[in-house]
């Protein structure tokens, strides 16, 4: 790939994603780009930071229905190494036997369903959600695409597709809505630091009743049982 070819492609992609008005346009473009890179399927998976004990995971894909159903039935999400950010030490992640060494049932099932080669790129969103873009193919043969070219293109595709979906307020990328005032965020920051209501009142030069009022109001806004959960969610999603 010549530099001018990549930068021409990059300009085209940036314009396309900026002009998209629906999520369907985003997914259609991802599918088209996967095909141009000689891959048969794509999957865009978003893992949210909350709830902590059962994080919200959403995905959109053109995988065969049989594979999606089998994957979900076997709860492969819990062991899938391509959705573990710790594995991305060198940019994009190529699927191979070593990667799936601790998830052999998943790897064997994927190949049995026709997924013999794949690659994944991930990105952290401003709301701390993790987005994983995967391309996979049925053929086991090597593809004539340089690793650097593939990585650069997938980096742009995962970034621009997720940013477009955020701009469109698509549910796949949106975390729980937390519309807090400036004062509420101030109180949240001190709550996250472990300060009591009385201590926060002294720091901000307001009454303790005012602090408690704001904390209760924030709990109502996100249906949280206590102020600790509000502060934890706000920190986990990058609000404070």
UniProtKB/Swiss-Prot annotation:
Gene3D superfamilies, sorted: Transcription factor LuxR-like, autoinducer-binding domain, Winged helix-like DNA-binding domain superfamily/Winged helix DNA-binding domain
Molecular function as annotated in GO: DNA binding
Induction and repression of expression: Repressed by glucose.
Domain (HTH luxR-type) ranges: 173-238
DNA-binding feature ranges: 197-216
Domain notes: Binding to the autoinducer occurs via the N-terminal 170 residues; as E.coli does not produce LuxI autoinducers endogenously it should be able to bind to a number of different AI-1 autoinducers, which would enable it to detect other bacteria. This was shown to be the case.
Protein name in the entry: Regulatory protein SdiA
Native species: Escherichia coli (strain K12)
Gene that specifies this protein: sdiA
């Amino acid at each position: 790939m010549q530099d001018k070819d990549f930068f021409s492609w990059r300009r085209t992609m940036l314009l396309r994603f900026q002009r998209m008005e629906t999520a369907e346009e985003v997914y259609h473009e991802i599918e088209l780009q996967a095909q141009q890179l000689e891959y048969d399927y794509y999957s865009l998976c978003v893992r949210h930071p909350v709830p902590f004990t059962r994080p919200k995971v959403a995905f959109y894909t053109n995988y065969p229905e049989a594979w999606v159903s089998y994957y979900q039935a076997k709860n492969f999400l819990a062991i899938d190494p391509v959705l573990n950010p710790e594995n991305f030490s060198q940019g994009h992640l190529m699927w191979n036997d070593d990667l799936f060494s601790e998830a052999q049932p998943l790897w064997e099932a994927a190949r049995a369903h026709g997924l013999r080669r794949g690659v994944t790129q991930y990105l952290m969103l401003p709301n701390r959600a993790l987005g994983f873009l995967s391309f996979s193919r049925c053929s086991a043969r090597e593809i004539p695409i340089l690793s650097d070219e593939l990585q650069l293109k997938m980096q742009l595709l995962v970034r621009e597709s997720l940013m477009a979906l955020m701009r469109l307020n698509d549910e796949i990328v949106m975390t729980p809505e937390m519309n807090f005032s400036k004062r509420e965020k101030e109180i949240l920051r001190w709550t996250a630091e472990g300060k009591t209501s009385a201590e926060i009142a002294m720091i901000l030069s307001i009454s303790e009743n005012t602090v408690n009022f704001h904390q209760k109001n924030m709990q109502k806004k996100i249906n949280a049982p206590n102020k600790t959960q509000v502060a934890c969610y706000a920190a986990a999603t990058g609000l404070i």
